[in-house]
Every structure is written in structure tokens, then in C-alpha cells.
């Protein structure tokens, strides 16, 4: 099955998106509070599966498309369909060169155009079940009324799509799709054009789960990598241009940098902890995102040196709230979380 068939075009109802935007505006406030919250991650040795900054020093030449690089060190990129792609300079200020997809129209009426670097990595065979993909990305809008979607899609080595994280160019919402045929589902999160975002996709191939954060905020938590029993290995992670009106694409584009995939011998996806609010009595309301059924210890500190365990929680459904009623006793209160062995 080719990539045109395994990608999905399903949309989201405007009524549902409007409701979710109310949540999104509240979560922007949370970002300022959560900046004090330290996430916990084990210092286990990592293996770099693939990493590039698209720099000239790596062999990337701005005079060629991304999939047509002349250097033997950079010519491994592959594409499906046709469309604009290549190398830009300083679109992220001070970051050197970046890759991009979009802007120039396809030579035919294809709906999907994707570029990727073949990985063909087998996490379980290599005893590295934890795989993290991170990328700095930005979407610049069309100057016309034709707005398209851009997404990141993860495939196995057989070319079967596991899941996608989609950035809707019309509604400015972030949505996701699994391999269950149900189409795109809302994450409740929005994005802005012409703004940089750090996207992190974390996968646990041992437990068949994936999560996503955008600028450190969780947008997808503990969803199945595959619902169809597909082979659990990592074939590639694609940048995808989804053209809404075949034959009439927008001149929008997505550029990206610091494209990196690392693998760890972890047993679970590291948790994400947020401070949701502070109650009138001074208590802090925390929200922890983790893997379903696992226990996590929430720790607190007033100086970032000495840490005290304040609560062990169980993420029964992957998300759990905790109210720290002792927070009012401290002028400063920092939090972190770790999986309880």
C-alpha cells in the first residue's frame, strides 16, 4: 500500500474545535507557571539513530533539493509524490541551515507529498524500546486563500503508517490520527503560523505507546503506536505536505531543523508534569501525564537541591491530578516526577 492510501484526509468539526480552543487559551496561562516545574528523566545512555542540522558542514547544499543532495553523506533522503523541498538559511535566526517542504507546487495533482530519511531501526531487537524524535519546526502560511496541512507521520519498515500529528492550516489546530481508520482526532491544542515550535514524539515500542509534546506541553498522551498489529519497528519519520485542493495548493511551507532520533533502554516514556492552577488557599493543582497503569512519585523542593517525595500516584488512564495542600507553606515550590519502580 502506498503512502497516498495510508495517510488520511479526515477533518475535525468546527464546533468541536471551538470548544477546545477555550481550553487552549487556559493552557497558555499554565505555561508560565509550569516553567518552574522540573521534569525528571533518567540519565541512561542513549544511542543516536539519526541526527542532522542540515548544515553545509554536514554536506547539505542549498543549491539542491533535500531529496536531491549531491553529497554521499546527505543524499539518503527519499520522497513520495512531487512538491517543493530543499534547504534554507537562517529561517531560524542563528540556526544556520534548515530543511523545508512545500511552497513550490507539485508537478501533478497529488494530495500528499512527503520526504523522509530511511531509518529501518528495530528497537526491540536492539534492546532499546524507547525512541524519541525531536525537531524544531515552523509553518509559514499561504499568501493566497489556499491553506494546506502539514504533518509528521511515523512508519514501520514495511511502509505501514503508525500514526500522524497534523497541523491544520485552516483551523490552526493540532490533530492526530492512528492506524485505526478513524481519521483525525483533536488534541485540544492550537498553533500559530510563523512561530517556532519544538516537537517531541516519544515512543515505547515495548508497551506499544506514544506521546507528543509541543514546546514542552503534552498534546498526545499514551496512545497506541499501532492498533492493527503492524510490525513494531521504526522505518521512517516523514515530513508531509497535505494539499487540501489538488491542483490548487497554497504556497505555504514548513521548515524544520535539529531533526533527531535517539533510542534508550527505558522501560517507560518519561512523565510530563504541569502546574495547572493555584487555589485560593495556596494549594497547587498538578497534572501528571504518564503511561496507563504505572505509578509515579511526585517530588517537591524549595531550592532545587533537596527533594522530598510528596505523593505516589497511579496514572490509571494515563493522566492523574494531584493537589499539594502543603504548597501554601513555602515561598517557592518546585516539582518533578519519576516512575516508581
Where do the protein language model's features map onto the residues?
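Bacterial N-terminal signal peptides
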Residues: 28-39
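Extracellular carbohydrate-recognition regions
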Residues: 45-80
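Extracellular beta-strand elements of beta-rich domains used
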Residues: 54, 257-261
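Secretory/extracellular carbohydrate-interaction modules
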Residues: 57-60, 85, 91-174, 265
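Short tryptophan-centered beta-strand motifs in secreted/extracellular beta-sheet-rich domains
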Residues: 133-135, 195-205, 210-212
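Short, aromatic/His-centered strand-loop micro-motif at the edge of beta-sheets
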Residues: 175-198
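Flexible glycan-contacting loops in extracellular carbohydrate-active proteins
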Residues: 223-257
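Short, composition-biased motifs enriched in small/polar/acidic residues
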Residues: 266-341
Amino acid at each position: 500500500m502506498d503512502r497516498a492510501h495510508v495517510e488520511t484526509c479526515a477533518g475535525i468539526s468546527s464546533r468541536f474545535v471551538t470548544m477546545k480552543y477555550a481550553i487552549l487559551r487556559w493552557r497558555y496561562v499554565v505555561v508560565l507557571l509550569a516553567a518552574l516545574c522540573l521534569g525528571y528523566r533518567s540519565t541512561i545512555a542513549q544511542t543516536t539513530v539519526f541526527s542532522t542540522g542540515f548544515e553545509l558542514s554536514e554536506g547539505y547544499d542549498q543549491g539542491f533539493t533535500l531529496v536531491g543532495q549531491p553529497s554521499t553523506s546527505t543524499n539518503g533522503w527519499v520522497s513520495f509524490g512531487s512538491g517543493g523541498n530543499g534547504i534554507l538559511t537562517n529561517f531560524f535566526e542563528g540556526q544556520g541551515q534548515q530543511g523545508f517542504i512545500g511552497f513550490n507546487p507539485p508537478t501533478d495533482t497529488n494530495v500528499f507529498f512527503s520526504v523522509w530519511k530511511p531509518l529501518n531501526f528495530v528497537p526491540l531487537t536492539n534492546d532499546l524500546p524507547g525512541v524519541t524524535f525531536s525537531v524544531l519546526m515552523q509553518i509559514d502560511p499561504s499568501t493566497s486563500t489556499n491553506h494546506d496541512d502539514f504533518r509528521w507521520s511515523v512508519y514501520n519498515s514495511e511502509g505501514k503508517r503508525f500514526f500522524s500529528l497534523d497541523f491544520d492550516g485552516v483551523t490552526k489546530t493540532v490533530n492526530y490520527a492512528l492506524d485505526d481508520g478513524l481519521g483525525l482526532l483533536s488534541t485540544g491544542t492550537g498553533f500559530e503560523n510563523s512561530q517556532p515550535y519544538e516537537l517531541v514524539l516519544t515512543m515505547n515500542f515495548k508497551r506499544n505507546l506514544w506521546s507528543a509534546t509541543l514546546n514542552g506541553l503534552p498534546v498526545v498522551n499514551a496512545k497506541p503506536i499501532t492498533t492493527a498489529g503492524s510490525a513494531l519497528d521504526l522505518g521512517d519519520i516523514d515530513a508531509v505536505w497535505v494539499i487540501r485542493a489538488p491542483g490548487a495548493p497554497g504556497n505555504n511551507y514548513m521548515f524544520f531543523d535539529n531533526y533527531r532520533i535517539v533510542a534508550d533502554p527505558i522501560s517507560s516514556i518519561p512523565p510530563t508534569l504541569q502546574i495547572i492552577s493555584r487555589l485560593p488557599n495556596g494549594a497547587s493543582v498538578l497534572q501528571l501525564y504518564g503511561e496507563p497503569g504505572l505509578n509515579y512519585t511526585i517530588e517537591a523542593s524549595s531550592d532545587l537541591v533537596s527533594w522530598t517525595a510528596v505523593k505516589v500516584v497511579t496514572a490509571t488512564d494515563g493522566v492523574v491530578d494531584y493537589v499539594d495542600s502543603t504548597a501554601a507553606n513555602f515561598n517557592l515550590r518546585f516539582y518533578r516526577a519519576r516512575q516508581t519502580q
